[in-house]
């Protein structure tokens, strides 16, 4: 017999989903049969599987050691990845906010290169709050060449909270970008977003009269706000706020108005500087008013400075850092 005590990180999950992750090789039909026969019990009583787990709940599994080992699966040694570790900006028992450097993937892709997710799981591996039924994960993915703030969940409760904040478009997400051409003032950009998956390229078409086409079932509405921080003859540094959050949204939206990111070849930009030239940084995250379990984050604002290489790039482009100020 094995006894499992539910900790805070796993609270809120359905019992059957928890068991499917814990007994990863067991068919769902087998798990439900074991529940009916009381070979698996919740708080010493029969359970159906749809119960929501609470911190302190006890699950008892009446299997032999061999049966339990079979359905648990063979332990696989964790991969030790090689990466540039991101700096931690904020951490509590449920979430992490890190500063991802340019060039590091947020999540692993087909290339198998290391990512923020790899670092996160290594970082949390020896944490007493980690479990076999929840894998810490990145919640807002940034492109490889985009640097800045990435939200990560350490627990199930943290994952659910961050997912709700992102899906509800209540989280303030602000970026800095170096774009080609001279811009002045501020503007709101609205359009329909289309993605060519094969080419991994996005196009955004301006909405006629500012009203979405309800008959267009393929295009997705996107909205980007920008204001100019500093401008020179050939370049401008802008602050952008995402109302929606689609893949390549900033890159494609700025390109659609004739001001692509400097160095963003895919969207029509040209190289600027000898080393890295694409400057797109997620530099500020603002939480809305929050009550309940995560009220500690209510109204909190997290902000990071430009990396040194970006300051040098702005100087090359004729934008003095003193002009950028604290945006």
What are these regions (language model features)?
Residues 1-327:
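RNA pseudouridine synthases
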């Amino acid at each position: 017999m094995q006894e499992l005590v539910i900790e805070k990180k796993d609270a809120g999950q359905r019992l059957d989903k928890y068991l499917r992750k814990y007994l990863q090789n067991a068919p769902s039909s087998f798990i439900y049969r074991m529940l009916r026969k009381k070979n698996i019990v919740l708080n010493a009583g029969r359970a159906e599987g749809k119960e929501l787990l609470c911190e302190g709940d006890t699950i008892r599994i009446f299997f032999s050691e061999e049966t339990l080992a079979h359905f648990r699966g063979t332990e696989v040694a964790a991969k030790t990845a090689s990466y540039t570790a991101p700096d931690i900006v904020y951490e509590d028992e449920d979430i992490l906010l890190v500063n991802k450097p340019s060039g590091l993937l947020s999540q692993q892709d087909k290339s198998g290169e290391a990512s923020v997710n790899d670092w996160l799981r290594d970082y949390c591996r020896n944490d007493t709050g980690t479990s076999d039924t929840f894998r810490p994960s990145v919640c807002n993915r940034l492109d490889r060449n985009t640097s800045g703030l990435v939200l990560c969940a350490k627990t199930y409760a943290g994952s659910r909270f961050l997912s709700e904040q992102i899906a509800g478009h209540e989280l303030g997400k602000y970026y800095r970008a170096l774009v080609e051409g001279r811009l002045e003032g501020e503007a709101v950009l609205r359009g329909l977003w289309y993605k060519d998956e094969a080419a991994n390229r996005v196009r955004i078409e301006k909405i006629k009269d500012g009203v979405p086409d309800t008959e267009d079932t393929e295009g997705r509405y996107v909205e980007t706000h920008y204001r100019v921080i500093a401008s020179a003859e050939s370049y401008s540094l802008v602050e952008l706020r995402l109302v929606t959050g689609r893949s390549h949204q900033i890159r494609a939206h700025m390109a659609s108005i004739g001001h692509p990111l400097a160095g963003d070849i895919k969207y029509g930009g040209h190289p600027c500087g000898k080393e890295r030239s694409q400057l797109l940084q997620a530099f500020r995250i603002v939480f809305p008013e929050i009550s309940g379990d995560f009220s500690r984050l209510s109204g909190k604002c997290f902000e990071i400075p430009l990396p040194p290489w970006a300051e040098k790039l702005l100087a090359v482009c004729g934008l003095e850092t003193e002009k950028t100020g604290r945006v």
